Amino acid sequence: MQICKKNVFLLYYGVLVFLSFQVSSSTDTISTNQPLSGFETIVSSGDIFELGLFTPTPDTYDHRNYYIGMWYRHVSPQTIVWVANRESPLGGDASTYLLKILDGNLILHDNISATRKSHTEGTSRRSPQKISEGNLLFHETVWSTGVNSSMSKDVQAVLFDSGNLVLRDGPNSSAAVLWQSFDHPSDTWLPGGKIRLGSQLFTSWESLIDPSPGRYSLEFDPKLHSLVTVWNRSKSYWSSGPLYDWLQSFKGFPELQGTKLSFTLNMDESYITFSVDPQSRYRLVMGVSGQFMLQVWHVDLQSWRVILSQPDNRCDVYNSCGSFGICNENREPPPCRCVPGFKREFSQGSDDSNDYSGGCKRETYLHCYKRNDEFLPIENMKLATDPTTASVLTSGTFRTCASRCVADCSCQAYANDGNKCLVWTKDAFNLQQLDANKGHTFFLRLASSNISTANNRKTEHSKGKSIVLPLVLASLVATAACFVGLYCCISSRIRRKKKQRDEKHSRELLEGGLIDDAGENMCYLNLHDIMVATNSFSRKKKLGEGGFGPVYKGKLPNGMEVAIKRLSKKSSQGLTEFKNEVVLIIKLQHKNLVRLLGYCVEGDEKLLIYEYMSNKSLDGLLFDSLKSRELDWETRMKIVNGTTRGLQYLHEYSRLRIIHRDLKASNILLDDEMNPKISDFGTARIFGCKQIDDSTQRIVGTFGYMSPEYALGGVISEKSDIYSFGVLLLEIISGKKATRFVHNDQKHSLIAYEWESWCETKGVSIIDEPMCCSYSLEEAMRCIHIALLCVQDHPKDRPMISQIVYMLSNDNTLPIPKQPTFSNVLNGDQQLDYVFSINEATQTELEAR
């Protein structure tokens, strides 16, 4: 009987919980008797918008701030469209927060216990309210709608499907509107929202994780009857022009053809609004980058797509690089850098390497009174004639302009613009770098220590030593003559022994079973034939420079065109790597692997003869602004699929399981039909059939392409190549080079840049512009998704190459990638080759045998 009663009680309790959940999850109203507490939310009647407590940093456990905000209910990741308490974030325990109707206002309260109060600062807005269970509670108003009190007891706050939160004087739809969120926007303009001309503005977030008001805003200029974007409430840098003409221009966008997006300008009631098809989702956002963007939600792709951004050039955003910062749109992100002699000054609380809002400050202070300052010319600059920072002298030649600045210690810089002389007596803002032979020369005042005076010192030094030099030379001639003969004898003997040793190694190579005459059309060429084929390694025959030496184009006596790789004497690749590359390519035969035709080991020279690839390496096309236009979407996918097939052969289907270890764009060669072929096997490793991973003392490869476990711990596996392939795939889709991100300047790596873009727009913004409209957006998004799966930190999280081949050829659902660790890289394609000990145990590298 007791068990039966217990079951009935549990059933009754469960029904009550279910019914209460249904009520709380379906309500769209906050009333006097129905406040919102903790993480409770209200949802618009059409299940479109949701309002409640959120945090922009859900992954942070310490110092987490909370805000009352509104977001799309079925959009992921969470997209915030309105924030109530932008300037008053909530901290501490979220369960103490209460959003309720009080005295005709919607008010956000923070009920703080006496214990918690003792650890908080400032009590000016808190007062004892009541004693509950022995704890004294303090009551704080964090945010309020701030309207005149209403005598009605039926005041309600209702969330509508338009995204408008309305405070009205009663439950009926005809009740008077006391306040609405559309009149107090944050950074987002939603369909149906009205911009009251001359009073309302949209202000960007301070950063992607900080909703507080930022530096940029969208306002209405009543004098020009146009929308303008403004920096720091003081400097406008973009204008729509006459509003009517600007609104009409939207009809010309191909992405908007067939939609019902329309703008309405009502000058009588002084507002502007826009409407869309109820089934679609559009929004206009004032972004943290200072760009005003029109975005549409793609249901199939589950991402926001930017249709329009104004201004479309990041460098047109006023002061995007701060004081004495130079903006260059053609530069790899970030587009900002400091002028010479200056260093970046971080904004308070910011450690973002892309953030130049704090501007740049001098490395060495000026000492004008000592006449120790000089002027450094910076060419091809677009100058901003801001009247607050630059004085315009309407007359005077270039020499006059320079002399005026030199004589004035407050002059920071000058420039001559035709007949005008520009003089900066304060900080210089909005400097832009243009293409060669464009713009003007900007003369920057620097301390002498920041400008090289090596030539002057060299001249003075040469004068001082002109008397001593003949005496020194005379005393050294006799000694030098004695040493020359001795040196020639010793060096000749060393060269002779080295040649004998190398020829012995060469014979070992030929006789040791690595290469046999039954090989795949392999042949040995003597050095003389190769010299003839390359015209003595002429510059005109040079195709490029690889990690281990230059590559030349040659023509054999039988008329065949070949590519000849000449191992550099300074290269870290020795005879071991040379043997490795020869044996691997001989034993590996696949249409997506480069074919080795011959070799030469003679004296100091080690050469490999490959089949000639008319389109050279992928990096020569991909990272060239003009040549990249040849790589349309179909061609890029052909390269991606061919590379995966070649890599799958190495990992799974070849006689030897091979880990390449240096997969990158410069090691992907393209034939005349753009078929990719993987090359450069000098650093490859042979794995046993059942071997999963290996360790090495010697880390070889290229910064930016190496997996974390390999670069930091020397652990090699198939997943090391998968990581490199992920970076290569990101490069192919974005057209950006992984090794352009400099570690010393603390710039983001390519992976960090791609990850942030993927989080914001599912990666749409990173797709290479030269592809124009040739690409399939869905395929591009899928490739970016696959690439991010490949560059995950842990090898076990990365897919196998066979899984990648399947992902690229199917449209099955992909797993969600984990955020990778953002690593920085060295400047340029720098080969890494160093030795370290793992757990103090000596490891040796396997050689091909």
Curated annotation (Swiss-Prot):
<keyword id="KW-0472">Membrane</keyword>
<feature type="domain" description="EGF-like">
    <location>
        <begin position="311"/>
        <end position="348"/>
    </location>
</feature>
<keyword id="KW-0430">Lectin</keyword>
<dbReference type="GO" id="GO:0004674">
    <property type="term" value="F:protein serine/threonine kinase activity"/>
</dbReference>
<feature type="modified residue" description="Phosphoserine">
    <location>
        <position position="571"/>
    </location>
</feature>
<feature type="transmembrane region" description="Helical">
    <location>
        <begin position="467"/>
        <end position="487"/>
    </location>
</feature>
<keyword id="KW-0732">Signal</keyword>
<dbReference type="GO" id="GO:0048544">
    <property type="term" value="P:recognition of pollen"/>
</dbReference>
<keyword id="KW-0325">Glycoprotein</keyword>
<dbReference type="InterPro" id="IPR008271">
    <property type="entry name" value="Ser/Thr_kinase_AS"/>
</dbReference>
<feature type="disulfide bond">
    <location>
        <begin position="405"/>
        <end position="411"/>
    </location>
</feature>
<feature type="glycosylation site" description="N-linked (GlcNAc...) asparagine">
    <location>
        <position position="148"/>
    </location>
</feature>
<feature type="modified residue" description="Phosphothreonine">
    <location>
        <position position="844"/>
    </location>
</feature>
<keyword id="KW-0067">ATP-binding</keyword>
<keyword id="KW-1003">Cell membrane</keyword>
<keyword id="KW-0418">Kinase</keyword>
<dbReference type="Pfam" id="PF01453">
    <property type="entry name" value="B_lectin"/>
</dbReference>
<keyword id="KW-1015">Disulfide bond</keyword>
<feature type="modified residue" description="Phosphothreonine">
    <location>
        <position position="696"/>
    </location>
</feature>
<keyword id="KW-0597">Phosphoprotein</keyword>
<dbReference type="Pfam" id="PF00954">
    <property type="entry name" value="S_locus_glycop"/>
</dbReference>
<dbReference type="InterPro" id="IPR024171">
    <property type="entry name" value="SRK-like_kinase"/>
</dbReference>
<comment type="similarity">
    <text>Belongs to the protein kinase superfamily. Ser/Thr protein kinase family.</text>
</comment>
<feature type="domain" description="PAN">
    <location>
        <begin position="368"/>
        <end position="447"/>
    </location>
</feature>
<feature type="glycosylation site" description="N-linked (GlcNAc...) asparagine">
    <location>
        <position position="111"/>
    </location>
</feature>
<dbReference type="GO" id="GO:0005524">
    <property type="term" value="F:ATP binding"/>
</dbReference>
<keyword id="KW-0808">Transferase</keyword>
<dbReference type="GO" id="GO:0030246">
    <property type="term" value="F:carbohydrate binding"/>
</dbReference>
<dbReference type="Pfam" id="PF00069">
    <property type="entry name" value="Pkinase"/>
</dbReference>
<keyword id="KW-1133">Transmembrane helix</keyword>
<keyword id="KW-0812">Transmembrane</keyword>
<dbReference type="InterPro" id="IPR000858">
    <property type="entry name" value="S_locus_glycoprot_dom"/>
</dbReference>
<feature type="active site" description="Proton acceptor">
    <location>
        <position position="662"/>
    </location>
</feature>
<feature type="glycosylation site" description="N-linked (GlcNAc...) asparagine">
    <location>
        <position position="450"/>
    </location>
</feature>
<dbReference type="Pfam" id="PF08276">
    <property type="entry name" value="PAN_2"/>
</dbReference>
<dbReference type="InterPro" id="IPR000719">
    <property type="entry name" value="Prot_kinase_dom"/>
</dbReference>
<keyword id="KW-0547">Nucleotide-binding</keyword>
<feature type="signal peptide">
    <location>
        <begin position="1"/>
        <end position="26"/>
    </location>
</feature>
<feature type="disulfide bond">
    <location>
        <begin position="321"/>
        <end position="336"/>
    </location>
</feature>
<dbReference type="InterPro" id="IPR001480">
    <property type="entry name" value="Bulb-type_lectin_dom"/>
</dbReference>
<feature type="region of interest" description="CaM-binding">
    <location>
        <begin position="626"/>
        <end position="643"/>
    </location>
</feature>
<feature type="modified residue" description="Phosphoserine">
    <location>
        <position position="837"/>
    </location>
</feature>
